[in-house]
Amino acid sequence: MKLVLNNRDEVFDGNQHTVSEIFKIMNFTFPRVVVKLNGKLIKKPQYHETIVNDGDNLEVIHLISGG
């Protein structure tokens, strides 16, 4: 499966994965993120059920706070 992840072409085994599976494959462990799939905001409770398909555009924005 090919997709655009954070403006980079990525290739994964299989035809589809959930957002949570992509996080695990990519070792994303950020505590606060904003996720958009094909321009649509995906809320954290939906990560396990939201399917990412071949050709999709997935954006994972890591939020950082500081003082």
What does each model-identified segment do?
Residues 1-66:
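Ubiquitin-like/PB1-type beta-grasp interaction modules and other compact soluble beta-rich domains
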